[in-house]
A protein has these predicted regions:
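C-terminal regulatory/oligomerization modules of transcriptional regulators
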Residues: 1, 125-149
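N-terminal leader segment of winged-helix/HTH proteins
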Residues: 1-31, 79
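Hydrophobic structural patches
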Residues: 13, 41-44, 134
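Alpha-helical linker/hinge and terminal dimerization helices associated
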Residues: 13-23, 60, 103, 107-119, ...
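Charged, amphipathic alpha-helical coiled-coil/dimerization segments
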Residues: 21, 72-132
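N-terminal helix-turn-helix DNA-binding core of bacterial DNA-binding proteins
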Residues: 22-66
Length: 149
């Protein structure tokens, strides 16, 4: 495939990716959240024992300052607690409080259900192919962006 044809597909893929991110952004706004805050809540929801702040940073490719600010917001609202990690006292484990679990329970399960239902509209073969191709493209993107600095 020549350069221009590939560029066309890159642009088309980018628009499709934007549609997906827009769905998250709009859903987050309905709950007075940013998409990044929504993603933090999602990670915590699916980590019942809590999650290290550093793991959240890594998963979201976010700076420590960004995640700390989000955690601080939820801490002030009484939605999370911070506990020192036994292996690294500089790192904190983030967990939901009872109020936080109740609050997030109204946000994340419906969103997760929507994702599952949306993907469920595809055939099993299409789902497997989507995941396989997305993994391959994501790895290629990671490598190429590391090469350019």
């Amino acid at each position: 495939m020549d350069y221009e044809e590939v560029r066309h597909y890159v642009n088309q893929y980018g628009r499709l990716r934007d549609v997906q991110f827009s769905a998250y952004e709009l859903y987050a706004r309905k709950h007075n959240l940013t998409a990044k805050e929504l993603f933090v809540l999602d990670i915590l929801w699916f980590s019942p024992e809590g999650c290290l702040q550093s793991e959240i940073c890594e998963r979201l490719s976010a700076t420590k300052q960004t995640i700390s600010a989000i955690i601080k917001k939820f801490l002030k609202k009484g939605y999370v607690t911070l506990t020192e990690s036994e292996t690294d006292r500089r790192n904190k484990i983030v967990r939901f409080t009872e109020a936080g679990a109740e609050y997030v329970g109204r946000i994340i399960p419906p969103a997760a259900g929507a994702e599952i239902e949306a993907m469920g509209e595809l055939s099993g073969e299409d789902i497997a192919e989507l995941v396989r191709l997305t993994a391959a493209f994501s790895e290629a993107m990671r490598k190429k962006f590391r090469q350019i600095g």
